[in-house]
């Protein structure tokens, strides 16, 4: 039975989420502030964390950053569930390490669909990494077991989502991949208008791979259509991390 940790100081929301998750067959644990939530994440090793942002003691952005820096919790998927719905809030959430972001008030069925998609996508291991083969094209090699890109001979460590997104683009290199297809293949759910999710992670990839992320040569935006990975023998510029 998958275990889900809810970190939220609003008992009405926590109880609503817990009841629906338990009815769907999940084991649910709760924490009411950021410090307790981080400690429980280490102790319980849940399959998914649902994280509010406006928490006592330590805010959700900071909690997520700490979870990502701790090797014991770095791979646990995080779904931010919060009343902060501005674009900048979403960008900050993804920048802090969230896998998905859902704004309150939310539809319960959509929440459950996001949970299923995250658990299905990760299963604590990204879908692309379930395949053992190394994928190579031109100057780019993806090593699934280490979530690593070899880019013009340089080793670049990727997050799980960055790896899956780059894997998706590499499989269709030279072709435009629509945001809808990316959301289906990488995040595992039917697309809505959640394009900002993709933009943030594309920006992260460009920071690691492009010599000038503001003027990308390899991961290109095809306006109105999607994104295209164009590989050439001209050297890229991301610094190994």
Swiss-Prot record:
It holds the Pfam family Trans_reg_C. The keyword Transcription regulation applies. The modification 4-aspartylphosphate is found at residue 52. Phosphorylated by SasA; phosphorylation is maximal when KaiC phosphorylation is active during the circadian cycle. Dephosphorylated by CikA. CikA and SasA cooperation generates RpaA activity oscillation that is distinct from that generated by CikA or SasA alone and offset from the rhythm of KaiC phosphorylation. Keywords: Activator, Biological rhythms, Cell cycle, Cell division, Cytoplasm, DNA-binding, Phosphoprotein, Repressor, Transcription, Transcription regulation, Two-component regulatory system. One of its GO terms (biological process) is cell division. Transmembrane segments: none annotated. InterPro entries: CheY-like_superfamily (IPR011006), OmpR/PhoB-type_DNA-bd (IPR001867), Sig_transdc_resp-reg_C-effctor (IPR016032), Sig_transdc_resp-reg_receiver (IPR001789), WalR-like (IPR039420), WH-like_DNA-bd_sf (IPR036388). Residues 132-231 bind DNA. It is found in: Cytoplasm. Residues 3-119 form the Response regulatory domain. One of its GO terms (molecular function) is phosphorelay response regulator activity. Interacts with reduced ferredoxin (petF). Interacts with CikA, RpaB, SasA, Sll0038 (pixG) and a number of other proteins. Response regulator of 2 two-component regulatory systems SasA/RpaA and CikA/RpaA involved in genome-wide circadian gene expression. The histidine kinases have opposing effects modulated by the clock oscillator proteins; SasA phosphorylates RpaA (stimulated by fully phosphorylated KaiC1) while CikA dephosphorylates phospho-RpaA (stimulated by the phospho-Ser-432-KaiC1-KaiB complex). The RpaA regulon is about 300 genes, and includes itself, cikA, sigE, sigG, genes involved in photosynthesis, carbon metabolism in the light and dark, phototaxis, CRISPR arrays 2 and 3 as well as nearly 90 ncRNAs. Genes are up- or down-regulated in its absence. Involved in regulation of primary sugar and amino acid metabolism and in adaptation to light changes. Regulates the accumulation of the monomeric photosystem I and the D1 protein under high light conditions. This is DNA-binding dual master transcriptional regulator RpaA.
